């Protein structure tokens, strides 16, 4: 009996399970995911520790990576006074620092700012979904 050559074995290996992420994340996708994660974590922190003074006085944190003011917002957030009692604040500041570094150095050429409205980061417009007439 003849043993199979290397070609069938190679084809079997290549036809195996596909990779979980076929393409690496881009600068834009990394910035977008990290900004959404930071905004979500900030909102959870506001709900879980609302009475803690250092949480209550943190700068508001709504991030829109298409708004030029987001860089100032991140810098202000990272520079806010330390919060020794709530470890999540330090974790959040580390993520904000990481996003600022990514936006300001690694991905600077990939950024396209569509807005320069700092008030939009303070008081974001809530996203509403309007259903088409047939789904009402």
Swiss-Prot record:
Keyword Signal: yes
Annotated signal peptide: 1-22
Tissue distribution: Specifically expressed in CD34+ hematopoietic cells.
Protein's cellular compartments: Secreted
One of the Pfam families matching this protein, by short name: CYTL1
Keywords: Secreted, Signal
GO MF annotations in UniProt: signaling receptor binding
Major location category of this protein: secreted
A single GO cellular-component term on record: extracellular space
Single GO biological process annotation from the record: inner ear development
Source taxon at top rank: Eukaryota
Presence of the UniProt keyword Isomerase in the record: no
Name of the protein this chain belongs to: Cytokine-like protein 1
This protein's encoding gene: CYTL1
